[in-house]
Amino acid sequence: MRRSMPSTASILAQLKAKADQLTDIFIKELASLAPELDLLTPADPDRRGSQVSFRFPEAYAVVQAMIAKGIIGDFREPDILRFGFAPLYLRHVEVWKAASVLGRIMQSRDWDRPQFKARAKVV
């Protein structure tokens, strides 16, 4: 007997549910690991999509410190850290790792090193 393929709507709903889980994990982990980050993204998953943004005065340096540790975030002027969550290939464990790395960077103030504050022409 042949199994029927899931509908497009079903697949999209599964992807949305996973994206919500990934962003929820990231937001909740950072609420305790890095409370100095000001969450800009709506807490309601139906209003936030698959990205999470925080405000922090030294956002550029934080993103550079994360890149040095292999975690790619996005910087937006003047002080925004932005992270995208692709549910097709990102795993929950990778989100926990990213939150942990960001938490350690914030707690250790690793971002406050000169090499992370030097602005590149293109980011």
Model-derived features: positions:
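Alpha-helical structural elements of signaling/regulatory helical domains
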Residues: 7-10, 58, 94, 111
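Short glycine/serine- and small hydrophobic-enriched flexible loop segments
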Residues: 1-6
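PLP-dependent enzyme catalytic core of the Aspartate aminotransferase-like
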Residues: 65-123
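Generic beta-strand/beta-sheet core signal
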Residues: 42, 55-57, 76, 84
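Helix N-cap motif at beta-to-alpha junctions
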Residues: 55-60, 89-92
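Conserved small-domain helix->loop->beta segment predominantly found in fold-type I
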Residues: 7-55
